[in-house]
């Protein structure tokens, strides 16, 4: 996708948000400054604070979920919204400020030769590092998915990614909502559907608000869940998408 085709395609930024009143307005405003022509949908995933109100005031469209469904459930809403309205590209951006809007253009240009472009924290740009069980899980997932996708993937759990028309059609039909399903199982689905996946290096910023969920216990749980999510994803069979169209 060249710089001219970025503006010719209909792009929807989908931003899952749960109790992100401290950061969501700022992130929306930053995205709009970088890409003023794109549309932005904040999916309020059952927040009990002013996330929806502040996102709307900042200029985003807002879809409110009655209960918390997790990132997968929020993104499923976003993909169905995009498919119903004829968007060509969906870009997932976190509402906590960790994903730098200045990297969006590179993600979009990556769709020139791919159906899914993952923004990787571990591809040689920036100083982000994982440690402990979380690191081991990410390394193991990287090895498995690099073999499955036949390309090097260093950050398969990244939530910063761009997806083209074939990915939108696939994920609007079904998008996993289980923990880690939105990253691990969705990539297995994409590989089985013969979608092309690649990654680009990105810089990850500090959270603008809220509290990170890392601790030794949670990291150990993450390792176990990552392995289980991968096992379930490989066992399950999901509907494929017509792969006759170009990326």
Model-derived features: where do they sit?
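Donor nucleotide-sugar binding loop of glycosyltransferases
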Residues: 20-23, 47, 100
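A conserved acidic beta->alpha catalytic loop
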Residues: 44-52, 97
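Short, well-formed alpha-helical segments that are part of the catalytic scaffolds
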Residues: 19-33
């Amino acid at each position: 996708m060249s710089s001219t085709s970025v503006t010719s395609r209909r792009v929807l930024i989908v931003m899952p948000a749960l109790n992100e009143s401290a950061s969501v307005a700022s992130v929306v405003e930053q995205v709009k400054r970088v890409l003023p022509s794109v549309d932005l949908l904040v999916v309020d995933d059952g927040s009990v604070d002013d996330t929806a109100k502040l996102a709307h005031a900042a200029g985003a469209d807002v879809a409110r979920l009655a209960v918390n469904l997790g990132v997968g459930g929020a993104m499923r809403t976003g993909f169905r919204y995009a498919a119903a309205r004829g968007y060509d590209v969906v870009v997932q951006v976190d509402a906590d400020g960790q994903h730098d809007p200045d990297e969006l253009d590179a993600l979009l240009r990556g769709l020139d030769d791919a159906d899914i472009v993952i923004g990787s924290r571990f591809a040689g740009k920036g100083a982000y590092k994982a440690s402990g069980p979380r690191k081991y899980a990410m390394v193991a997932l990287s090895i498995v998915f690099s073999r499955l996708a036949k390309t090097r993937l260093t950050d398969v759990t990244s939530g910063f990614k761009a997806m083209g028309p074939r990915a939108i059609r696939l994920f609007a039909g079904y998008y996993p909502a289980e923990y880690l399903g939105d990253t691990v199982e969705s990539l297995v689905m994409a590989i089985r559907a013969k979608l092309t996946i690649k990654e680009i290096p990105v810089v990850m910023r500090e959270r603008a608000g809220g509290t990170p969920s890392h601790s030794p216990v949670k990291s150990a749980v993450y390792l176990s869940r990552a392995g289980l999510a991968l096992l379930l994803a490989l066992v399950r069979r999901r509907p494929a998408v017509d792969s006759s169209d170009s990326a």
